[in-house]
């Protein structure tokens, strides 16, 4: 990871070529939530690389993806957040605001297929 995170608590998603990790927090002290997105290239060994940033910092985002887009929803900063962000997995850059979750969540779980995703 580009920044050491003692306890990850981030959301992960992937395409067939890249894996992304977003959010989480730096621990030990000073305890700080982050908005970082890192990626790895699945077919090669090596360190992760900076992908970009989420729109807000936080730990515990749920994540979904298909082969093109990764979506991160909900997080804790320090209160629960409704924000949903998305990225285009094939290109690096900052996340874009997708909208808001109907309810406020953190420490979400997500799953998806090639057509849509669910978060809880």
Question: Regions from the language model: what does each represent?
Answer:
Residues 1-120:
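Polar, enzyme-active/binding microenvironments
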